[in-house]
Regions:
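Active-site microenvironment for binding and transforming phosphate-containing groups
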Residues: 1-153
Length: 153
């Protein structure tokens, strides 16, 4: 899967091309969509669990907290084919932690990994405006952000 190979290939390429050692590397993560807002399907959970032993710790199940839906669930049922129900928890994935864990697995020490930790989908400025662009939250109609990879000789 792509999500696993980005960190592995990036660090592998740096080792081959530049002789970089993981213990000498610094990494910064974020901002990015947080586990609070990043819902995924069962297939994503399955893919992660097939590749990472720690995958279960990356997922949380979020249940609808609407008290009316909780008290009167039959009011919100829709006629859907078997197996296509949206009743049940949303599965949320912590991509930021997933990336941090992959960097650790690649040999970087925890002290060399900085995490911003702000969610691009829900972090707001004091005036209520978005602090970041969020492709997922804004359905693709967004500005852009920049990431930088550099090397100091």
């Amino acid at each position: 899967m792509l999500f696993r190979s980005i960190v592995e290939r990036g660090i592998g390429t740096m080792r081959l091309q530049f002789g970089s050692r993981p213990k000498d590397l610094l990494a910064a993560i974020g901002p990015g969509i947080g586990a609070c807002c990043y819902s995924v399907g069962e297939e994503v959970r399955f893919d992660f669990e097939s590749q990472f032993a720690y995958a279960p710790s990356l997922f949380t199940e979020v249940y609808d907290s609407d008290p009316v839906k909780t008290k009167y669930p039959l009011l919100f049922l829709t006629a859907r084919a078997p197996g296509h129900s949206n009743i049940g928890p949303q599965i949320h994935l912590d991509l930021i932690e997933a990336n941090r864990r992959q960097l650790l697995d690649a040999g970087l020490s925890a002290s060399k990994i900085s995490v911003v930790g702000e969610c691009t989908a829900c972090t707001r400025l004091p005036n209520g405006q978005r602090r970041y662009f969020s492709h997922r939250d804004e359905h693709g109609y967004t500005g852009r952000m920049l990431s930088v990879i550099g090397m100091i000789e």
